[in-house]
Structure formats: structure tokens, C-alpha cells
From Swiss-Prot:
Gene symbol of the encoding locus: proB
Compartments it resides in: Cytoplasm
SUPFAM superfamilies per the UniProt record, alphabetical: Carbamate kinase-like, PUA domain-like
Residue positions binding substrate: 47, 134, 146
Organism listed in the record: Thermotoga maritima (strain ATCC 43589 / DSM 3109 / JCM 10099 / NBRC 100826 / MSB8)
Keywords, ordered alphabetically: Amino-acid biosynthesis, ATP-binding, Cytoplasm, Kinase, Nucleotide-binding, Proline biosynthesis, Transferase
Protein name: Glutamate 5-kinase
Keyword Transferase attached: yes
E.C. numbers: 2.7.2.11
Length: 353
């Protein structure tokens, strides 16, 4: 069976004291070529652009100044892609560069365009090499780290597997033992962060959980042995495994994990129970509105204690919803002056937590 596999490789594996570890990238590409020869589709989520730019320019020092970091990424991304291209050329494999920001996923139109692009690349049998577009990403639109990017990309691509490579064997519990199957009751040992990377083990766990909740089987495992990639796809126990929890439909997965909520709708206990039973949200169950949003925006639905109940695409603007909150659907025309939608958020456009 042909599988879609996403492998994420961080700076701590790709970058050494003298710059990009070209020999390591060659090993990784060899392993990807092996999987492709078996018919599988592979995408690589790569870090390393900033470090590659730093080494290539051969001057300066590490800095937190945003414009310097973005300039280093702009220079380094070219060097990074050259190394991948040269490594894959040996196997006759062509690659594509994809640079993304959070807005690519949260904006529904751009998200669908990304999915269509990936379909096209699949038809050309091209390996996507994916990174965050750090040269334009600001604090408002940054993904924060490539672990999050890997999870979001896995969901957008409808991947079967997500492999998060790290420098350790997997998730380590407070007793120093490897956690082979993850559950949220595990007490963790603090593993810290790498010198170049932005994500620690907790970031990887959150990303693996996000993917698994959308039906992607994930692992956090050692990237020092690139054969772990093939072994995991073959079904061997590798690292810390996050079992898939049922695949959400593409639209609901987007609503749940990729969209950016524009506001909140507060609901009463009766509405909360109705939503959890698979019903749509009606005006009578709404107790309050927070934020400014329009028809078609994604909103969070929260209960009276402020706990998340779900997310959904709303059929009313925040101003109109404030007017009809708590009222029966039969009262809408009198309140609004027009025949409003009887449903605030339809169950087909809703993810329930």
C-alpha cells in the first residue's frame, strides 16, 4: 500500500560546527529514495536555513535582531536547497521548494491552494522540501518552530505517517526511560532545546498529538539513524509512537487545528450537551459573544466556564449574533428584519473537542 510520509529534520541534526552536514543530508536522501522506490510519497520538513546562511556569509555572530535572522534565512535557504538537490540528483529524484507561514494554513483559500499544489507535485513525482518562510514571517504569522509546521503540513497533505527526528531516542519519562507508546499521563524529563532550534521535546509532543488527532500515526525518534524512517513505515517500534485517533474529514481537520479563530461564542449547558451529541448550535443556546467576526469566519465555542467545546464556521456576524443570542429561531426575523439562518454553526462545519 502506498503511504504518504512526512519526515521533519531539525537544525540540531542538519547543522554542525562547520555548517550544513552534507553527509547527513546525503544519508537522509538515500533513505527517502529507498522509500520512494517502494512507491511511497515523501515530504521533508527541513530546518537549517539560518544556520546555513550564518556559515555561508562567514561573518557576524548570532543575534536576536529579526532583520538579521531573516537575512540569514534568505541566504541560507538557497544553500540548503542546493545540498538537497545535489543529494537527490544521484537517485534521479526531483525536488520542489515550499515556503509557508501560518497564514498559509489559517486562510482557507490559501490552504486549499496549497493542497492543490501538493496534488500537482505528486503527479510529477517530486519530493517537496518544506520550510517556514522566515524571510517574511513576523511574530503575528510565525509558526514558532518546524515541529508545528510538520504537524500542520501532515494534516494538509492527508499524510499517513509523521516522523519527527530528534537527537534522542524519543520521549524520556521522569525516570529516564523511553516512552514507547505516548499517553498524556506521562511525566516527562525536561530535555531542553538545541542551540539553533526553537522547539524542545514538548513542542514535538504537541505536534505529534495534533497530527495523531487527525489520523496521522506519528513518532518522535532519533534521527542519528536515518533508517528509523523506513523502519517506522514498515511498522517496527521506533522511538515514541503516537497512535492515530481516527481520521477527521479534511474540512473539520482544518477547522480544528489549522484555522485561526476570529472570536468566541459562549454557550449554555444545554447547548454544550447538544453539540457533544452531534447537533448544530442554535441562537437560543448562545449566552455571549467575544471579538469581532463576520459570516464565514471560524470561531471558538466555549462553555460558561470558558472551557473549549469546539470550533466552527459561523453563519452570523458578531454584531448580529449579539442581537439574537438567547432567542428562539422563530424570533429572528422580528429581531434582525430579515430571515436569518436558523443555525448559528452547523454541525457539518463544526469540530467538537
Amino acid at each position: 500500500m502506498i503511504m504518504k510520509v512526512v519526515v521533519k529534520v531539525g537544525s540540531n541534526l542538519l547543522v554542525g560546527s562547520s555548517g550544513l552536514r552534507k553527509s547527513y543530508i546525503a544519508e537522509l536522501c538515500r533513505e527517502v529514495a529507498r522509500l520512494k522506490s517502494q512507491g511511497h510519497e515523501i515530504s521533508i520538513i527541513t530546518s537549517g536555513a539560518r544556520a546555513a546562511g550564518f556559515t555561508y556569509l562567514g561573518k557576524g555572530k548570532r543575534t536576536q535582531d529579526l532583520h538579521i535572522k531573516q537575512a540569514l534565512c534568505a541566504v541560507g535557504q538557497v544553500q540548503l536547497m542546493k545540498v538537497y538537490e545535489n543529494a537527490f540528483d544521484f537517485y534521479g529524484i526531483k525536488i520542489a521548494q515550499i515556503l509557508l507561514t501560518r497564514d498559509t494554513f489559517s486562510n482557507r483559500k490559501r490552504y486549499l491552494n496549497l493542497r492543490n499544489t501538493l496534488i500537482g507535485l505528486s503527479e510529477f513525482d517530486v519530493v517537496p522540501i518544506v520550510n517556514e518562510n522566515d524571510t517574511v514571517a513576523t511574530e503575528e504569522i510565525t509558526l514558532g518552530d518546524n515541529d508545528t509546521l510538520a504537524a500542520m503540513f501532515s494534516i494538509a497533505w492527508d499524510a499517513d505517517f509523521l516522523v519527527l527526528f530528534t537527537t534522542v531516542d524519543g520521549v524520556i519519562d521522569e525516570n529516564g526511560k523511553l516512552v514507547e507508546r505516548f499517553d498524556e499521563s506521562v511525566k516527562l524529563k525536561d530535555m531542553g532545546k538545541s542551540s539553533w532550534g526553537t522547539g524542545g521535546i514538548r513542542s514535538k509532543i504537541e505536534s505529534a498529538l495534533m497530527a495523531s488527532r487527525c489520523g496521522v500515526k506519528a513518532t518522535i525518534c532519533s534521527g542519528n539513524d536515518v533508517s528509523n524512517l523506513t523502519r517506522f513505515v514498515k511498522g517496527e517500534p521506533v522511538g515514541t509512537v503516537f497512535e492515530p485517533q481516527g481520521r477527521l474529514k479534511a474540512k473539520k481537520a482544518w477547522i480544528a487545528f489549522l484555522s485561526e479563530p476570529a472570536g468566541k461564542i459562549y454557550v449554555n449547558k444545554g447547548a454544550e450537551e447538544a453539540l457533544k451529541s452531534g447537533n448544530s448550535l442554535l441562537p437560543v443556546g448562545v449566552t455571549g459573544v467575544e471579538g469581532t467576526f463576520d459570516v464565514g469566519d471560524v470561531v471558538e465555542i466555549v462553555n460558561e466556564e470558558g472551557e473549549l467545546v469546539g470550533r466552527g464556521i459561523v453563519n452570523y456576524s458578531s454584531s448580529d449574533l449579539e442581537k439574537i443570542a438567547g432567542h428562539k429561531s422563530s424570533d429572528l426575523k422580528k429581531i434582525l428584519g430579515y430571515e436569518g439562518n436558523k443555525v448559528v454553526v452547523h454541525i457539518d462545519n463544526m469540530w467538537v473537542a
